[in-house]
């Protein structure tokens, strides 16, 4: 048997649509695998009632098929589905590491990224790596074509998750098909600023680099109370706020000593919009780990 914990992740970070991602130290999924003649899946934990156990419809089933590694697979969900915190990526990454070890495939973490992404395709319709890369490799990741660059960094974060659901497919439909040159220049500047901030573990630069005027406003429309929550977080000391992945989670960066205040402010702001929410006081962390 192999047991692996894989973390929640936040993709895009505002200016890095389909490129940037970070691993969070909490929440996380735990996946256990045992060899079998055919793949079976059992799902428990947060939102398990919404996750199919048919291997042909589950992300870990796709990973098992890609690795030619049939197994009895148990998934203990800690990352809620349709949260914007890389729920499917956490399961796919954990399964990839566990099955790679169980069958002694000898693949590196980097080589497992496209395999885990095949599982992501079941959820979003496309094999994106912006969540599975940090879930496997940890830290801050930059995905460009088939190359993934990883940066170890120490950045405090707050991930606030409201009790509403936004599907990845719906969130992709609202993304504009084209942008202006002015918007492109602004996004490139923000992305460069954020990258420098990650390399320097500088929350002020990371927060400034989250600013983006194309994808974020479109997806924010799907999150009830987004503008109010964003302003509350900034007032409480956040240096930057954006939609986490497809949403509805909202990610804030701040100094470590402001995390508690930022988390409380975001929860209170959602309450004024009649939305229940919880906040994870977290940070950029390691990727999938063997138990």
From Swiss-Prot:
MF term (GO), any: homoserine kinase activity
Q: In which pathway does it act?
A: Amino-acid biosynthesis; L-threonine biosynthesis; L-threonine from L-aspartate: step 4/5
Query: What name has this protein been given in UniProt?
Result: Homoserine kinase
InterPro entries per UniProt: GHMP_kinase_C_dom, GHMP_kinase_C_sf, GHMP_kinase_N_dom, Homoserine_kinase, Ribosomal_Su5_D2-typ_SF, Ribsml_uS5_D2-typ_fold_subgr
Where in or outside the cell it occurs: the entry states:
Cytoplasm
The function of this protein is: Catalyzes the ATP-dependent phosphorylation of L-homoserine to L-homoserine phosphate.
Reported EC number(s) for this entry are 2.7.1.39
Q: Which UniProt keywords apply?
A: Amino-acid biosynthesis, ATP-binding, Cytoplasm, Kinase, Nucleotide-binding, Threonine biosynthesis, Transferase
Q: Which organism is it from?
A: Haloquadratum walsbyi (strain DSM 16790 / HBSQ001)
Pfam families, A to Z:
GHMP_kinases_C, GHMP_kinases_N
Family designation: Belongs to the GHMP kinase family. Homoserine kinase subfamily.
Q: For this protein, what reaction is catalysed?
A: L-homoserine + ATP = O-phospho-L-homoserine + ADP + H(+)
Annotated GO biological process: threonine biosynthetic process
- List the GO cellular component terms: cytoplasm
Q: Which enzyme class?
A: transferase
């Amino acid at each position: 048997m192999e047991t692996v914990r894989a973390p929640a992740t936040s993709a895009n970070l505002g200016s890095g649509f389909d490129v940037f991602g970070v691993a969070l130290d909490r929440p996380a999924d735990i996946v256990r695998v045992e060899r079998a003649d055919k793949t079976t899946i059992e799902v428990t934990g947060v939102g398990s009632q919404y996750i199919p156990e048919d291997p042909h419809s589950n992300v870990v089933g796709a990973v098992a098929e890609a690795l030619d590694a049939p197994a009895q697979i148990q998934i203990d969900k800690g990352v809620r589905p349709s949260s914007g915190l890389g729920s499917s990526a956490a399961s796919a990454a954990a399964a990839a590491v566990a099955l790679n070890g169980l069958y002694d495939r000898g693949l590196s973490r980097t080589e497992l990224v496209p395999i885990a992404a095949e599982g992501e395709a079941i959820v979003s319709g496309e094999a994106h790596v912006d969540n599975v890369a940090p879930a496997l490799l940890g830290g801050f990741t930059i995905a460009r074509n088939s190359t993934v660059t990883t940066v170890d960094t120490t950045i405090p974060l707050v991930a606030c998750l409201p009790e509403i659901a936004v599907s990845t497919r719906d969130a992709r439909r609202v993304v504009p098909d084209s942008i202006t040159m002015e918007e492109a220049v602004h996004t490139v500047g923000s992305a460069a600023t954020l990258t420098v901030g990650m390399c320097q573990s500088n929350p002020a630069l990371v927060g400034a680099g989250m600013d983006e005027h194309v994808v974020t406003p479109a997806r924010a429309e799907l999150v009830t109370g987004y503008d109010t929550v964003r302003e509350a977080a900034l007032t409480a000391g956040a240096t930057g706020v954006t939609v986490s992945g497809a949403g509805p989670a909202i990610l804030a960066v701040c100094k470590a000593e402001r995390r508690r205040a930022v988390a409380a402010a975001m929860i209170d702001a959602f309450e004024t919009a009649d939305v229940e929410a919880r906040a994870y006081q977290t940070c950029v962390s390691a990727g999938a780990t063997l138990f």
